[in-house]
Amino acid sequence: MLALTSIVSLIYAEDDGLAFLTSALIAFAVGGALHTAGSKKEGKRMTRADSFLIVALTWVLFSAIGMMPFILHLRMSPADAFFEAMSGFTTTGATIIADVDGLTYGLRFWRSMMHWIGGLGIIVFSVALIPVYEMKNSNVY
């Protein structure tokens, strides 16, 4: 998604494309390292607690990677950039950016993608919980 956002920046001839490409390379490196470290071991089964831990850590990891363009291009502090990314991936909609309309098209696209991915993640997480806890649909909403 970060690489796709750099294409948006390229189309609009904006100067934030390098921030997205750098972030994409960092994400690729982290993903490769986690894939190598988490290769399936024989005889190991994932427990319910492991599943919840993975979901929670994934949200934190997505936010840590998602904050990179804000740090690299807008020179935001890490705390502000993490807040902005976590807000997007949890779909809370809160922002600390005073002029969202003044952002580049690439950053606006990235913010939109974070909210979309976050919304999709919450739906998938909810659907995954229903069978585990044998909930009825009326108990979810």
What positions do the PLM features span?
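Membrane-proximal intracellular helices of multi-pass ion channels
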Residues: M1-Y141
